[in-house]
Amino acid sequence: MAFSFDLAVIFQRERRMKRKSRVTIRRRRRRDMCKSHEPMPYIPFDLVIEILTRLPAKSLMRFKSVSKLWSSLICSRTFTNRLLRVPSFIQRLYVTLTFLDNSLQRKSKLLSSSSSPGSDISTMSSFVVDRDLTTPSMKGYYLSHVLRGLMCFVKEPSVKIYNTTTRQLVVLPDIEESNIIAEDHKNKKIMYRIGHDPVGDQYKVVCIVARPNDEFGELRRYLSEHWVFILGGDKSSGWRKIPCPSPHLPITQILSINGRMHYLAWVQKFDPMLVTFDFSSEEISILQAPEDIRWFKSNPIEYYGKVALLNLSDLKRECTMNLWVMEDVEKNMWSEKTLVVHPSQMDIVKSTSLRVAGTTRNNEVILVPHNIRYTLTGEVIVEPQNTTLLYIFLYDLQKNLMRKVEIKEPPYHTKFWDVVGLDDVENFMYL
């Protein structure tokens, strides 16, 4: 018994000595590392950038607080441009909802739905609403469009720009020098558009102000002004007026592609012209639109990197769409083709009014149920949708195939809903 007790004491003492020895070794190693003058392994700057570009946006926003160096790096134009070159596999669909709350007050919500990373939108059957982007500062404003992660909110004549990644919101100054904005004209039109200048690597906001010319005997049918504001620049510079060769009145939505924006407009007669604004040179050019095109329900779209015009005038009646593609800008050459909806989908287009809301990166046209009608006096009336189920159609112009994509799990049930469009860029630009 005594022998067993002595043996246990010896074993316990040995365990203590071994434990103490391991602790001593760890402390000695730590002390030697502190005394060592060998430099830490060098990580190339390009590799640091490459690692950071693979991180999600939330992580990068947290890393801005690590140090001033990290903050300046993440907010730098070089890093932002590097992120834009990294292909994103998440396409977000932006949806607006209007409904009455429990106190019968009208409320508006801005939601975005995201696909799963790595999913292919060409085979998707649904989007899932998972983000509420509504903020009190947006109250009274409507979302005009989204470009490269930048949202444009308008409440004429005011405009706000919101970065969906950094959650930064800026209010642009009023255009006090505009003669048309200051006028109280019932047919006055104000349009804003965000664009990117690839030469100067700047984001700019263009404001188009126009109205009919009511003075009898004047040769000019319309009065218009173009103003430009540089985002992230010197705030004291403000808005700059851009000369326009011919006053005109925009009649369609605006397409931004390859550093330019395009839209149809009336210049003198009611024949539509294609107006192009170059974000780099800040020059405006006006080209003749295809002779046989009808401006009503015509929208500029991107068609495999080219400017195209898609007309839906005959979609509901004849189940056809007309597509014009600009093949040569210098010669103003257009190609035309008529698309006939597949027989199995004719009932859909005959029973539903649709409008164009842009294109996907796979060149599918986004078609949204249309619930807006115009009175004879030009008044816009928004009617409720036929259902509280949210959905869009994606139309492949080359394959001539249309498919329905549902928008699932909206947090509010309402027939007043609309889709702004798709965007798949995370932008860390400081506004």
From Swiss-Prot:
Annotated keywords: Kelch repeat, Repeat
Claim: Repeat is one of the keywords in the record: yes
SUPFAM superfamilies per record: F-box domain
Kelch repeats: 143-189, 227-275
InterPro entries, per database record: F-box-assoc_dom_typ3, F-box-assoc_interact_dom, F-box-like_dom_sf, F-box_dom
Domain F-box: 37-83
Ranges that cross the membrane: none
One family name in Pfam for this protein: FBA_3
Protein name (database record): F-box/kelch-repeat protein At4g19930
Source organism (scientific name): Arabidopsis thaliana
